[in-house]
UniProtKB/Swiss-Prot annotation:
Record flagged with keyword Transport: yes
PANTHER family assigned to the protein according to its UniProt record, in alphabetical order: NONRIBOSOMAL PEPTIDE SYNTHETASE, PYOCHELIN SYNTHASE PCHF
Pfam family, one: AMP-binding_C
Effect listed in the UniProt record for changing V151D: Does not produce anguibactin, impairs ability to grow under iron-limited conditions and decreases virulence
Resulting phenotype, Q303P: Does not produce anguibactin, impairs ability to grow under iron-limited conditions and decreases virulence
GO cellular component annotations of the record: cytoplasm
Protein name according to UniProt: Anguibactin system regulator
Family: Belongs to the ATP-dependent AMP-binding enzyme family.
Swiss-Prot/TrEMBL keywords: Activator, DNA-binding, Ion transport, Iron, Iron transport, Ligase, Plasmid, Transcription, Transcription regulation, Transport
Signal peptide span: none
Effect ascribed to mutating T888P: Does not produce anguibactin, impairs ability to grow under iron-limited conditions and decreases virulence
Species: Vibrio anguillarum (strain ATCC 68554 / 775) (Listonella anguillarum)
Length: 1048
């Protein structure tokens, strides 16, 4: 390799890097310990009819002219300038006689080698000799040392030398050394603890929270993709003219279009953007790194582009002229320690070379890579046209996402550069057209006509055609269609005698059984509205619902002792008496659009809210499912869901409308897989419909006890919570041809609104997707500003169509807040988060508010907090849901100062739970109670919920706070079984199986061991009596009376 000596003597042997260079280099090294990534700018230019010798001579002249090219970047964060440096002879690849496909491959290989190189050389140059006397020049600059304007200067000076003009002499006083020392001295004067500096940092929003598919640190190597937008000279001048008319710079106009696009894909109104600003007025003609990054909080959405761009101009000027210099290196370090939202600060950049720059020559190819930049936009003028260079690390993002962002940017840029455009008009939608088209198509699928029938009508039609078919099986009892209809008509007659009129609300408060189905059919036949109110909640809460719903008559079971009235406001009618009444001869005439039922769900203010669903809304869902899966007279469903849980609506009316059979279990058997398996096998159940946790329990039990029950199920429908990725295969291990269906929706949208037939589960899936809307239902994914989110962007799921509830009963304010009417379409805001995949598939991403799903029940944490705060002595309480797959509730309590448990312990966890049981259903009472002196707070002064979650994994004063030792032989027997299953752990009388680490799998193993020891324990008993003390008593009773369910 021939070498030429570099004659330029630099005045210093080494030079400290600037803060910006330190940041770039340190970030690069953080990501290059095991990865292939460096900071560089790479350009390719073609030169025609110029000899190679001439080109080499001119390049050598430029390199000798600029001392930076003689430097070496070392590991000590200094630039070293050897006394004698050398210029390597440029590599040459002769392709002058190669075929086109070979040339294309060689050029691609060259680019790949150059861009993936980990060389720290300041400049690397090679030639490709192409046919037709063309030389392709490949130049790679180390961008830690050479900035974008310097790259431009390099090629301008090459053009100057090739034209025969000499280079100007460098100013020996304005050098790189002078610049670096000046910047570093300025940094020394910055007080990083000053209030003004911290004020600036803390007011910055996060960078655009773009969807990603991996963390940058996990990339094996980085490929940079450059995409370019070109705006004609005419349109560019129009954009400049309009910008100046509104007193904004063209740079801020281009950056504001960028922030608008980033805002949509980042699901945020405000975002941080890094402007790479080069201050070179005093350093003209010098190649080096003069970039001073500036972090600016940009607006991404306003009512018009004019208000947005003017706002951003103001924000930029405030940041630029801020009275305290804000070094980016220190900014980034501080931001990354504030919160997770700043985990990757300053990773999106905007830069420009629009002033006094017009590249006479256009680059053939190029790209720019920085370890701390995921996406950059660089604006330049080439041959009088605006060229916008988008450089992105595509491997970080979902496929084609950056391309879609580029198209939206192009569309908005084209619109704003039109002649006579009005920037004060509302911003147009930027959702890519192809995405909009796919969503419109899937939201209009299906040919299902809106039903004009009532929810119960098809059942009574089936009575006429198949009167002797089995309608219900419950243990040894069964009812055929005609008998069930007879009971329902008599019940309707009894309700009429009790004064119930069409449109009245009638409560159903009884345990699971035949009576529930008789009751709801009878209520609907009488033209009334059924309101299921669970017995598994305090009487005070039940009566609050009765009063709120305007209920006078309550259908009960004669054996339910909990239904003793506390006053004479309500008339209690047991269904066994009701079916002995004179039957109602013909059904009450009701419009299909009128309410069929009201289901009360948890309310954030502490008061449950009643969801009002119409006949046609609910029946439309039932018909859609029945048609899709060909549900018919030979189908039987195991009905596990409680009546106040809307899966029961399909269990009852879906099957009875199709002529099928409902197989019931008792209230105590609803959590007992032994009973489920027996019912499935004995009664040939073909369908399963439940929350995922119950089906998981069925499969686990079947595997442990060698049951064939899952193989009987031709159709499994799961909804109401996350579905484990392993469930489809575990099910198909029993039945290869079984249909596994994932569903979702909201009580406010008639049972379900979406469906997905799960065939295979790809490795890359994070969860089972929601799928697609059911016929006559629609979905939108919407951000906080009401914009439809692009593919992969998380937003709130809105449901539209014929299943939408009529609102919340007697609560106009809540109805208006959740049910929106836009352009003639009704939408329900679910509070669930989701995103679209490019093919139109919906993915569920969890809740956005304080509402959670626990055991399939939708729970407002706010309602639990209201109940906790009602307890005397509680200063403040916070409830959270803990866990991913199997969530449990935990509550944190700060007592009034004079009643803090640390001092006087006036309350313990068990007392809190007893008090909550008087206000809330059992499933809403937290299993874990933790007392605190104060709540942990975030930097913004809010309760730190993540810190609370971490506390649940540490030993605190919890529901096991009173650790009474195990003393009886029975308790010791239980403790040994638990230790065998859970592993060695310290157990006490009050130790809770599930809080001690137990789950559904462990619970089944406990039951299995109990059976081997001669105790006929049911799984439901462990769920019901989950402490050592309670379970020991139950075990003893089961030993004495194995055929009976013992009661404490």
């Amino acid at each position: 390799m021939n070498q030429n000596e570099h004659p330029f003597a630099f005045p210093e042997t080494k030079l400290p890097l600037t803060s910006n260079q330190n940041w770039q280099l340190s970030t690069q090294r953080q990501r290059t310990e095991k990865k292939s990534i460096t900071n560089f700018t790479y350009q390719e230019f073609d030169y025609e009819n110029i000899s190679r010798d001439t080109l080499e001579r001119c390049l050598t002249t430029i390199i000798k002219h600029h001392p930076i090219f003689g430097a070496k970047l070392s590991d000590d964060f200094y630039l070293h300038f050897p006394s004698k440096t050398h210029i390597e002879t440029f590599a040459v690849n002769d392709l002058s006689n190669a075929l086109k496909q070979d040339i294309d491959k060689q050029l691609a290989d060259t680019r790949s080698a150059v861009t993936k190189s980990r060389s720290q050389a300041i400049i690397s140059i090679m030639f490709s000799i192409l046919p037709k006397n063309i030389i392709r020049l490949h130049v790679r600059f180390n961008s830690v040392v050479v900035d974008n304007p310097s790259v431009t200067l390099f090629f301008e000076q090459l053009t100057q030398l090739l034209s025969g003009s000499p280079l100007s002499f460098l100013n020996q006083e304005q050098t790189i050394s002078a610049y670096n020392h000046k910047v570093n001295n300025e940094l020394l004067s910055v007080d990083l603890e000053s209030a003004r500096w911290n004020e600036y940092i803390l007011t910055l929003p996060s960078s655009a929270n773009l969807p990603t598919i991996c963390e940058p640190e996990k990339l094996d190597e980085t490929d940079i993709t450059r995409r370019c937008i070109t705006l004609s000279q005419r349109k560019w001048q129009q954009l400049v003219t309009v910008s100046k008319k509104h007193n904004v710079t063209p740079e801020i106009t281009l950056a504001s279009i960028f922030s608008t696009v980033l805002s949509l894909w980042g699901h945020q109104k405000y975002l941080m953007m890094r402007f790479d600003i080069t201050k070179i007025n005093d350093y003209t003609g010098i190649i080096g790194q003069f970039t001073e990054p500036l972090l600016v909080g940009m607006s991404g959405f306003e009512q018009s582009f004019l208000s947005l761009v003017k706002n951003n101009q103001k924000k930029f000027e405030e940041a630029y002229h801020y009275d305290v210099k804000v070094p980016v290196f220190q900014c980034v370090n501080k931001l990354s320690n504030i919160s997770d939202s700043h985990r990757y600060p300053a990773n999106i950049t905007f830069s420009s070379e629009l002033l006094n720059t017009n590249h006479s020559k256009k680059a053939v190819w190029g790209c720019r890579q920085s370890a701390n930049t995921w996406l950059s936009l660089h604006a330049v003028i080439e041959q009088e046209q605006l060229v916008l260079q988008w450089d992105s690390q595509d491997a970080i993002f979902p496929k084609d996402m950056i391309k879609d962002m580029l198209h939206s940017y192009t569309d908005l840029l084209d619109l704003l550069s039109q002649k006579d455009v009005n920037w004060a008009q509302p911003l147009p939608t930027l959702l890519p057209k192809h995405q909009e088209s796919i969503r419109n198509k899937i939201n209009q699928q299906g040919d299902l006509e809106l039903t004009k029938e009532l929810l119960h009508q098809r059942f009574f039609k089936n009575v006429e055609s198949t009167p002797n078919a089995l309608a219900i099986i419950h243990g040894q009892e069964s009812l055929d269609y005609i008998t069930l209809a007879s009971y329902a008509k008599s019940c309707a007659g009894a309700l009429t005698e009790a004064g119930v009129k069409s449109g009245d609300r009638v409560a159903v408060t009884m345990n699971k059984g035949i009576g529930q189905i008789v009751a709801v059919l009878g209520i609907l036949y009488a033209g009334a509205i059924y309101v299921p109110v669970s017995l598994d909640q305090p009487q005070e809460r039940r009566e609050s619902i009765y009063q709120g719903a305007g209920i006078n008559v309550i259908l009960i079971n004669e054996s339910d002792s909990k239904n003793s009235p506390s006053n004479d406001l309500f008339f209690f009618l047991d269904w066994q008496t009701a079916i002995k009444s004179e039957p109602m001869r013909s059904p009450q005439d009701v419009a299909p659009s009128q309410p069929a039922y009201i289901i009360y769900t948890s309310g954030s203010t502490g008061t449950p809210k009643g969801v009002v669903i119409s006949h046609q809304g609910a029946l439309n869902t039932c018909i859609a499912i029945n048609r899709r899966y060909q549900i018919g007279k030979n189908d039987r469903v195991l009905a596990l869901s409680a009546l106040h849980f809307d899966l029961s609506v399909y269990d009852i009316f879906g099957l009875l409308s199709a002529g099928g059979t409902i197989v019931l279990v008792s209230e105590l058997e609803r959590r007992d897989p032994i009973a489920w398996c027996q019912a499935i096998e004995e009664h040939n159940v073909t369908m399963w419909n439940s929350v995922p946790a119950l089906f998981d329990m069925l499969l686990t039990y079947a595997t442990c006890f060698n049951s064939i029950a899952p193989s009987k199920l031709r159709l499994t429908m799961l909804s109401g919570d996350w579905i484990g990725l392993d469930l489809p295969q575990r099910y198909r291990n029993y039945r290869v041809d079984g249909q596994f269906i994932a569903m979702g929706g909201a009580t406010e949208a008639s049972i379900w609104s979406n469906v997905f037939d799960v065939e295979k589960v790809p490795m890359e899936w994070r969860s089972i997707p929601y799928g697609y809307p059911l016929p006559r239902q629609q979905y939108r994914v919407v951000d906080d500003l009401g914009r439809d989110c692009p593919d992969w962007v998380a937003g709130e799921l809105w449901i539209g169509g014929d299943g939408i509830a009529l609102g919340y009963f007697d609560d106009e304010l809540k109805t208006q807040a959740q049910f929106l009417h836009i352009d003639g379409h009704a939408w329900y805001r679910t509070g669930d988060m989701g995103c679209y995949w490019p093919d139109g598939t919906l993915e569920f991403l969890g809740r956005r508010d304080k509402q959670v799903k626990v055991g399939g029940y939708r729970i407002e944490l706010g309602e639990i907090e209201v109940a906790l705060n009602n307890i005397p002595g509680v200063q403040r309480a916070v409830a959270i849901a803990v866990g991913n797959k199997d969530k449990t509730l935990a509550a944190f309590i700060v007592m009034d100062s004079e009643q803090a448990p640390i001092v006087t312990a006036p309350l313990d966890a068990e007392e809190v739970q007893l008090l909550l049981n008087k206000q809330l259903p059992n499933y809403m009472v937290p299993k874990r109670i933790i007392f605190l002196e104060t709540f942990p707070l975030t930097a913004n002064g809010k309760v730190d919920h993540k810190a609370l979650t971490r506390m649940t994994n540490r030993e605190k004063k919890t529901s096991q706070s009173i650790n009474k030792p195990i003393i009886t032989a029975s308790e010791d027997r239980v403790a040994k079984i638990w230790n065998d299953v859970l592993g060695p752990t310290e157990l006490y009388k009050s130790s809770d199986f599930f809080l001690s680490g137990g789950d559904a799998y462990n619970a089944i193993e406990v039951v299995k061991r109990c059976h081997k020891a001669g105790y006929l324990i049911k799984l439901s008993m462990l769920y019901r009596y989950s402490t050592i003390e309670a379970f020991a008593i139950i075990m003893d009773r089961c030993r004495l009376a194995p055929q009976e369910e013992a009661e404490l």
